[in-house]
């Protein structure tokens, strides 16, 4: 396993570090609040080819690997870019998988996003890009849906992310059955991996902000960074950053292997876990912990200034806290990982979603045709309209 970046990947890193340094950063993030989207910067990002770079070249994309994409989004996180880079990249790849990646998606002219949790009733709730995406892709049971209708109403949140609920009304079917479930599951693991890379970028900059501040801030005639109590707060953070970066790189590596048809191993008794779904979840948990602790400690050493809007660290603190819990409570993600490694625990109650949620449903529902209007899960069984 070689997790070192190639020469081409280092070039990608430098190109996008320069781009986000110019077109993103704390000033642009403040200007994009509260929705968390800068349309001018997004138009300029389109010129780099980033929105479609993860789509296969045979479909008009850039043919980038998942590892390539982690390089890009780490820089987006480091510069706290108010752009839906992760969600658009992941959703474009998913749409390409089911043969529905339009040119507007490839170029970024149409912003798309992924519903990271199943619908509740006739609504997909808390979609990460729901307030800016023209199309959201959601999985309802075994049916993969395209939810159009334009951006939803922004849900205020401390992280200033473009969250919104999106109604399923008017959704069309992209695919259904086990292949649709597998494609969405793969996309969700890619989302975990790229969100982890974003959190690594946030951690990196937050650590730099804290270290730079304690070098400059003087008290009692000395830089406060010379005091042991301050040093102890920051000393272990580089190790957390390295661990999060390592797991994220390993998850991306496993994802690229899986895409090439090389299955991984998920066995708690094995010293070398190579299963993509397992590593993606591990990376998200560890990167989330690293980002929340690092931004917390960095804000702490800023003293009262850390809480003021004029200082940049509060932007990273809020973004880290939001991203770390956006998918789910980290404790539940850890439980999911335990199920993957040790086998599922006995259920303590009825499932909340999926085909088993309706005990009366037919085991082999009539498949929906691609592009058909979606009439809700009941229509798969009874043919009734919603």
Stretch-by-stretch model annotation:
Residues 1-79, 187-365, 369-386:
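Alpha-helical interface subdomain recognition
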Residues 80-86, 93-208, 212, 345-386:
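FAD-binding core of flavoproteins
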């Amino acid at each position: 396993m070689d997790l070192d970046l190639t020469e081409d990947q280092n070039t990608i890193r430098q190109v996008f570090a320069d781009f986000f340094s110019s077109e993103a950063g704390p000033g642009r993030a403040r200007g994009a609040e509260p929705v968390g989207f800068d349309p001018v910067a997004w138009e300029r990002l389109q010129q780099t080819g980033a929105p479609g770079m993860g789509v296969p070249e045979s479909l008009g994309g850039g043919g980038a690997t998942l590892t390539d994409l982690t390089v890009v989004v780490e820089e987006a996180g480091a510069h706290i870019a108010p752009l839906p880079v992760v969600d658009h990249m992941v959703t474009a790849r998913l749409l390409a998988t089911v043969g529905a990646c339009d040119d507007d998606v490839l170029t970024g002219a149409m912003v798309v996003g992924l519903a990271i949790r199943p619908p509740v009733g006739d609504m997909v709730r808390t979609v990460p890009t729901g307030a800016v995406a023209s199309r959201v892709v959601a999985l309802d049971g075994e049916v993969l849906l395209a939810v159009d209708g334009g951006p939803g109403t922004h849900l205020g949140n401390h992280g200033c992310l473009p969250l919104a609920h999106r109604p399923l009304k008017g959704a069309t079917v992209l695919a259904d059955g086990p292949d649709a479930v597998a494609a969405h599951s793969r996309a969700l693991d890619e989302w975990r991996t790229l969100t982890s890379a974003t959190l690594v970028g946030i951690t990196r900059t937050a650590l730099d902000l804290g270290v730079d501040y304690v070098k400059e801030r003087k008290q009692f005639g000395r830089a406060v960074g010379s005091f042991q109590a301050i040093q102890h707060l920051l000393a272990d953070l580089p190790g957390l950053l390295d661990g999060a970066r390592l797991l994220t790189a390993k998850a991306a590596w496993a994802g690229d292997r899986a895409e090439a048809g090389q299955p991984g191993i998920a066995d708690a008794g094995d010293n070398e876990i190579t299963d993509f779904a397992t590593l993606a979840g591990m990376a998200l948990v560890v990167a989330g912990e690293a980002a929340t602790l690092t931004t917390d400690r960095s804000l702490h050493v800023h003293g009262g200034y850390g809480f003021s809007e004029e200082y940049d660290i509060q932007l990273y603190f809020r973004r880290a806290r939001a991203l770390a819990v956006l998918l789910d409570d980290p404790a539940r993600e850890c439980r999911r990982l335990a199920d993957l490694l040790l086998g599922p625990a006995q259920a303590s109650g009825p499932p909340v979603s999926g085909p088993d949620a309706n005990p009366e449903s037919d085991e082999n529902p009539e498949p929906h045709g691609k592009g058909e209007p979606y009439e809700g899960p009941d229509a798969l069984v009874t043919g009734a309209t919603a």
